[in-house]
């Protein structure tokens, strides 16, 4: 498991004074500010953040060292990370998305179905996007106790009982 967890991303600039549009991936979106300073994926660049206001789909924020609209524009797409040990501990039945990505998915009979490509949420519940050599296109598996009875992070595997006809 990675020591860095992605907690947000820069969606672009906001205004003309160097603010950015910040999208938070935290369960409580405002909590992203508690993890300041954030880093880039390599952990080398550090960005102190201050949220300035809520906006549609996120926040306007000041990132340390960003003073102009052009500098803010250049950061569009930047994913922002914090150290895993700064995040709250999760109950046994909850997982950080980053820990699920890359896990192999097996059915209850032990047949490999594929690997988790991403975790998505379209409003109702999380969905695991499963891809693999035997699949024509990725499959979205509901991330529920019924469809995914076992997640074993130590063995890097998921046991799934997918709805009939999904695979």
Swiss-Prot record:
An accessory protein needed during the final step in the assembly of 30S ribosomal subunit, possibly for assembly of the head region. Essential for efficient processing of 16S rRNA. May be needed both before and after RbfA during the maturation of 16S rRNA. It has affinity for free ribosomal 30S subunits but not for 70S ribosomes. GO terms for molecular function: ribosome binding. This is Ribosome maturation factor RimM. One of its GO terms (biological process) is ribosomal small subunit biogenesis. SUPFAM superfamilies: PRC-barrel domain, Translation proteins. Keywords: Chaperone, Cytoplasm, Ribosome biogenesis, rRNA processing. One of its GO terms (cellular component) is cytoplasm. The PRC barrel domain binds ribosomal protein uS19. Binds ribosomal protein uS19. Belongs to the RimM family. It is found in: Cytoplasm. Its main location: cytoplasm.
């Amino acid at each position: 498991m990675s020591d860095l967890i992605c907690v947000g991303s820069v969606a672009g600039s906001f205004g003309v004074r160097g603010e950015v549009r910040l999208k938070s991936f935290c369960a409580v979106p405002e909590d992203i500010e508690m993890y300041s300073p954030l880093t880039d994926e390599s952990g080398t660049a550090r960005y102190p953040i201050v949220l300035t206001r809520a906006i549609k789909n996120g926040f306007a924020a000041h990132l340390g060292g960003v003073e102009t609209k052009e500098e803010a524009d250049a950061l569009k797409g930047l994913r922002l990370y914090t150290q895993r040990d700064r995040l709250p501990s999760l109950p046994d039945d909850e997982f950080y998305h980053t820990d699920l990505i890359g896990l192999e998915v097996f059915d209850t009979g032990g047949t490999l179905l594929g690997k988790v490509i991403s975790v998505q949420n379209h409003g109702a519940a999380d969905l695991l996007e499963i891809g693999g050599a035997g699949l024509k296109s990725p499959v979205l598996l509901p991330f529920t106790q019924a469809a995914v009875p076992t997640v074993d992070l130590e063995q890097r595997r998921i046991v799934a009982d997918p709805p009939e006809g999904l695979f």
